[in-house]
């Protein structure tokens, strides 16, 4: 990803990046085909309206501009709304649910539960921490998929209301809490050292700030939340969302991150999220 402040800076960064990639590929006996090289703009609606596409056309005429691109199974769009990703995900999950519904009578409840988790829930949980801060309508679309999966497991009508008691029976968290659950687990991995370095450096405890002074916040396991100016591209970033969600957890849950096993922390975190959730089904 290339971040530039102005047009001239963008041109030089693109040229340097292409030259670096080409040199690396040449050293590994590969060749960069610029005719198949594509790029994707990221920014707010105002920033995208001000973009100068002629700059890239002048620097690399063969570059093809995209409105969305797939990366590690996730469809990224220019404004990071993930609308296309959720649409594709909904299509895939509902297709799997329809297939499972046709063979439901031939499966045991345990087998059906396993298949729903394998073909539906795993798809919804994959990369869902990147969905933090998306529009409420996007979260509702994902929640509808969970509702349909719950109706299939409990063998109720597709028009039946999914009450809080049913969710307690399945012990499933709502989509919004599932996103917070995965993000908090990622922060925990950063604190114990099992996450990559580029993520660990984003989760800085208060005790290790520039003043190096021990405070009450450091005893409670509080992390530093950077200041940001933008809502979509600032607060949604892991450097802000991760520490912010972590600081909202109770002190006893945060302390389990480094003092207990991953399983014990996940149980405590899930219990807390269940106690705090507001059910609107």
Language model features with spans:
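Short, conserved catalytic/metal-binding micro-motifs enriched in Asp/Glu and His
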Residues: 1, 25, 69-79, 93, ...
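Catalytic palm subdomain of template-directed nucleic-acid polymerases
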Residues: 1-23, 133
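Hydrophobic packing residues in well-ordered alpha-helices of helical domains and bundles
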Residues: 11-14, 18, 32, 86, ...
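Short, conserved micro-motifs composed of acidic
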Residues: 16, 23, 30-68
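Short, charged alpha-helical motifs in flexible N/C-terminal segments and linkers
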Residues: 22-40, 138, 143-207
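Amphipathic alpha-helical
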Residues: 60, 197-243
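Basic, alpha-helical interaction scaffolds
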Residues: 62-130
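Structural motif
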Residues: 66, 106-118, 170-180, 228-233
């Amino acid at each position: 990803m290339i971040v530039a402040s102005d047009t001239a800076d963008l041109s030089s960064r693109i040229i340097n990046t292409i030259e670096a990639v080409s040199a690396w590929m040449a050293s590994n006996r590969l060749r960069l085909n610029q005719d198949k090289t594509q790029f994707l703009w990221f920014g707010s609606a105002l920033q995208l309206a001000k973009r100068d596409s002629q700059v890239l056309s002048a620097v690399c005429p063969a570059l093809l501009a995209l409105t969305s691109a797939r990366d590690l199974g996730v469809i990224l769009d220019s404004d990071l709304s993930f609308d296309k990703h959720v649409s594709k995900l909904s299509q895939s999950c509902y297709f799997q649910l329809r297939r499972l519904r046709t063979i439901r009578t031939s499966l045991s409840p345990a087998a059906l539960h396993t298949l729903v988790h394998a073909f539906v829930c795993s798809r919804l949980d994959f990369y869902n921490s990147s969905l933090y801060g998306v529009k409420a309508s996007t979260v509702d679309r994902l929640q509808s998929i969970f509702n349909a999966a719950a109706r299939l497991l409990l063998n109720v009508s597709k028009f039946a209301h999914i009450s809080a008691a049913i969710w307690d029976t399945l012990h499933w968290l709502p989509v919004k809490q599932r996103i917070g659950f995965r993000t908090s687990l990622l922060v925990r991995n950063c604190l114990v050292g099992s996450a990559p370095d580029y993520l660990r450096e984003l989760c800085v405890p208060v005790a290790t700030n520039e003043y190096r002074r021990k405070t009450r916040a450091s005893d409670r396991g509080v992390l530093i939340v950077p200041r940001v100016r933008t809502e979509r591209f600032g607060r949604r970033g892991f450097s802000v969302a991760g520490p912010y969600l972590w600081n909202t957890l109770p002190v006893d849950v945060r302390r389990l991150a480094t003092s207990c096993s991953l399983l014990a922390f996940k149980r405590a975190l899930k219990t807390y999220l269940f106690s705090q959730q507001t059910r609107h089904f």
